[in-house]
A protein has these predicted regions:
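Transmembrane and membrane-interface helices of multi-pass
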Residues: 2-152
Length: 152
């Protein structure tokens, strides 16, 4: 059986994948939020520093995972999945209770799961399926296209 060769991207290609992937993670996160994506982008256009401040945690995570794994596609896939799931949880919580997801809610996970039975939740299965499909596609790209290894 013939083994398929994986292609290795140039350092510029790897940097481009990381940059576009970070923007994709940000847009995915914003698209999962409650409200209009266009109105959110308009508010970022009025205050560009807000976009940068919202983007840097995703960029930091993507770069950290890239330096740990050495693959830009896996990094972008993981970053999109983590931030997308946080945005998805925020969407469901805002619709159910009217208040946003905060880090302290993680400590209340078991209590929240017990209380979830009291709510009629719209789980937005289509959005969740699209998020997971996108992350799987990005991970598959990591199998087919290898990134150049990070050098310090």
């Amino acid at each position: 059986m013939k083994k398929r060769k994986s292609h290795i991207m140039s350092p510029a290609g790897t940097a481009l994948v990381l940059l576009l992937g970070i923007l994709l993670a940000a847009m995915t996160t914003l698209a999962l939020e409650q409200g209009s994506l266009l109105s959110t982008l308009e508010s970022f256009r009025a205050e560009p520093v807000l976009f940068v401040l919202n983007l840097w945690p995703m960029a930091a995570m993507a770069l950290l995972v890239y330096f740990l794994l050495g693959n830009a596609w896996y990094s972008v896939s993981f970053t999109t999945l983590v931030w997308g799931l946080l945005s998805y949880v925020n969407l469901v919580k805002v619709e159910a209770r009217g208040d946003p997801f905060v880090p302290g809610d993680i400590l209340l996970l078991t209590e929240g799961m017990e209380a979830a039975g009291n709510y009629q939740l719209d789980m937005h299965w289509g959005k969740l399926a699209l998020l997971l499909g996108l992350c799987l596609l990005l991970a598959f790209m990591g199998i087919r296209l290898k990134s150049s290894r990070p050098r310090l």
